A protein has these predicted regions:
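Catalytic active-site module of serine/aspartate enzymes centered on a nucleophile-bearing elbow/loop
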Residues: 138-170
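Short alpha-helix in the alpha/beta-hydrolase fold that links the catalytic acid
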Residues: 111, 125-134
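Conserved hydrolase catalytic core segment
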Residues: 1-31
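Conserved alpha/beta-hydrolase catalytic His-Asp/Glu region
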Residues: 29-36, 48-108
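Short beta-strand/loop motif that positions the catalytic acidic residue
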Residues: 109, 115-117, 121
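Glycosyltransferase donor-binding loop in the core domain
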Residues: 45, 49, 81, 121-124, ...
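Hydrophobic "lid"/C-terminal helical patch
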Residues: 57, 93, 132, 159, ...
Length: 170
């Protein structure tokens, strides 16, 4: 959700921003099917299904490599997500379901920009990151190996290296 917020900040306050990192995100609004799925998940949460929803989310947040080699990080992440209130989860899903597209602003971005994505990200596949990088003049793209939607946890060394290099560049 951070990428959606960052793109809207650039849209409204570009003169205040020195650099942009778009990480495992996309510029598209939800289509009707994705929006309906978010509202199904809201209903599930309201009917006591928070644990099921979050367990299902973990199945698509992490790469197959992480499932095979680092089950502990999945457990820690699930435990952390379970601490969120139902209302926070519902408001987050509503915000994502109703967000506007921001693809139309990408070509106008004139600040340094880096796009990062996990090689095995199911939620925001690398093709969506490639599209954004191609639209933002002068931007760079890094696809982080052996990671899904949470590369900062799954392959933190590669993630941090790209982050540090970008931040040192300006």
């Amino acid at each position: 959700m951070g990428g959606y917020i960052a793109l809207n900040l650039v849209k409204r306050y570009s003169e205040r921003i020195k650099g942009l990192i778009l990480y495992d995100t996309q510029c598209y609004a939800d289509n009707a099917q994705a929006r309906a799925k978010r509202y199904e998940n809201i209903a599930l949460i309201r009917n006591g299904g928070k644990q099921k929803y979050l367990e299902d989310m973990c199945k698509i947040l992490f790469s197959p490599v992480t499932f095979q080699q680092n089950g502990e990080i999945i457990k820690i992440t699930l435990d952390l997500m379970l601490k969120a209130t139902d209302e926070v989860l519902i408001q987050t899903l509503e915000a994502m379901a109703e967000r506007e597209e921001t693809c139309s602003i990408l070509s106008a971005i004139k600040i340094p920009a880096m796009v990062l994505c996990g090689e095995h990200d199911i939620l925001t596949p690398p093709e969506k990151s490639e599209y954004m990088q191609q639209q933002i003049p002068g931007s760079v793209l890094h696809v982080i190996a052996n990671s899904g939607h949470l590369a900062h946890l799954e392959n933190k060394d590669a993630f941090n290296q790209h982050l540090n290099n970008f931040l040192k560049s300006f």
